[in-house]
Amino acid sequence: MGAPVLPAAFGFLASARTGGGRAPGPVFATRGSHTDIDTPQGERSLAATLVHAPSVAPDRAVARSLTGAPTTAVLAGEIYNRDELLSVLPAGPAPEGDAELVLRLLERYDLHAFRLVNGRFATVVRTGDRVLLATDHAGSVPLYTCVAPGEVRASTEAKALAAHRDPKGFPLADARRVAGLTGVYQVPAGAVMDIDLGSGTAVTHRTWTPGLSRRILPEGEAVAAVRAALEKAVAQRVTPGDTPLVVLSGGIDSSGVAACAHRAAGELDTVSMGTDTSNEFREARAVVDHLRTRHREITIPTTELLAQLPYAVWASESVDPDIIEYLLPLTALYRALDGPERRILTGYGADIPLGGMHREDRLPALDTVLAHDMATFDGLNEMSPVLSTLAGHWTTHPYWDREVLDLLVSLEAGLKRRHGRDKWVLRAAMADALPAETVNRPKLGVHEGSGTTSSFSRLLLDHGVAEDRVHEAKRQVVRELFDLTVGGGRHPSEVDTDDVVRSVADRTARGAA
C-alpha cells in the first residue's frame, strides 16, 4: 500500500487537562493551515491544534473510540506498514486513517502496539486519566512535552511549549531535557511515555532500540536483502499515481533511492542543490541521464546560504553545530522549491548504519563508531520533517525505515567496508540500477558537496576567530540562534547571521585575551 501524497497532519500542539479547556495558542515553524479540535470526555478533554497542508483535510489525523473508556488519538506523520498491521486486527471495516489504525491496535495490544508500527510519526493518546505520548522508532518526528499534575502538553515543535511554560513542567527522568527550555522534555526515540494525568508521573517504555548483534551473510544474500528492503521501503513511500521527487546529489545514497523510486513510480522528478562555490551537478547529471528523470538544479549563493542558518536552527531545534551544517543546505533547498507542496524522498541517513562518513578501514574501529552513532542519534533531530514543512513540503527517508535500518545495522562490518570500498553492500545492491561511476563514487556529504562546512568556517575566520577555536565558535553561534528563535520566539527573518557571528567572535576574542 502506497502513501497518500501528504500526511493528514504535519504536526500538532495538544493539551490534556483534568478540568478541560482549550489548548494554548500554537507557535509553529511548519507552514500550513491550523485546525483546532476539542474532544471533551466529561472533564477530561483533549484539545489540540493540527498544522497541515492547506490542500489536505486533517480529519484522519484524529480518531475517537467510544468502546470501553472514551479514547482519543492525535497523530502527525504517517505509518508505512499498514497492510501488515491490518492483518493482525480483527475482521471489520478498515480504519479510515493512521490515527484510527493506532486506536484499533491499542485496543488489541495496549501500548505494546507501538512495537509493531513502522512509520514516521508522533502521537498523543488520551483515555481517562491516562495519556500516552509515542514516537516512531527513530524519533524522526520529534515530540516534546511539558507535564504537571492535571495537565500534559505535547507538541511536535519545542517552540510551541517554550511559549507556554506556566506552570513549569515536572522533571521526567527518562526523557531528554531541552536545553534552555525549563520544564520542556523530548520524548525518546522509539518510546512511549505512559503518563498519569492526575499525578503527572510518567513511565517510559522502549518500543525499539538499535541492535548490537551482527549477522554474517554470504555476499550475494546480503546484497539481495539490502536491495529488497530498500525497494520495499521506497515503494511504501510512493503515492500511486503521483510522481515522487528525490533530492539527488549523485552519490550512492540518494541515487539508490532515486533508482528505486523510478522503478516504483515509473517516472521521477529530481532536484540538486549547490552554491556558487561548490556543487555536485555533474555527478547528479549522470544519474539523471541514466534514469531519464525530470531534473532541476538550484544554485544558492554562499552568502544567502549562511544567512539561512537561523531557519535551519529554528526548524530542526538542534544545538549541534555539526548537525546544523548537514541540515543547512537541505533547509535552503526546501525553501527554494516553488510550486505546490511535494512529497520528497531523500537518501539522508544511510551513512549512520553503514558507517560511511568515517572512512575507516579497520573493522573493529568501524563497528565501534557505528554502534556509538546508533546509540547517540536521539535528540539530534536530523530527520525532523519541519526542515521541509517550514516550506510546506513533506520529506521521508527510506534508509531509516525500520526494516531497512534493522537490516543495515545488523550486517557485520566486513559487508560495509569490503574490497577497499565504503558502504560496499549498498553499492553492490544498486550496481545494476545505476551508472558505474555513481556506484564507485567515493563518499561526499551534502555539507561538503555544497561547501557549507568550509563556508561557515570561513565566515568565522573572517570575523577574527582563531582557527583552533572555530568549532567552539560554531557551537556558540548555533546555541545563540536557538535561544533567539526557539527559546525567544523570534522569527528567523528578524535574526541576522552576521550579527550573531560578530557577537560570538567578539566574545571569543575577549576570552582569548
Swiss-Prot record:
One of its GO terms (molecular function) is ATP binding. Its cofactor is Mg(2+). Mg(2+) binds at D253, D351. Coiled coil: none annotated. Keywords: ATP-binding, Ligase, Magnesium, Metal-binding, Nucleotide-binding. One of its GO terms (biological process) is clavulanic acid biosynthetic process. Its EC number is 6.3.3.4. Binds 1 Mg(2+) ion per subunit. The keyword Metal-binding applies. One of its GO terms (cellular component) is cytosol. It is an enzyme of class 6 (ligase). Pathway: Antibiotic biosynthesis; clavulanate biosynthesis; clavulanate from D-glyceraldehyde 3-phosphate and L-arginine: step 2/8. It catalyses: N(2)-(2-carboxyethyl)-L-arginine + ATP = deoxyamidinoproclavaminate + AMP + diphosphate + H(+). Homodimer. Belongs to the asparagine synthetase family. This is Carboxyethyl-arginine beta-lactam-synthase. It comes from Streptomyces clavuligerus.
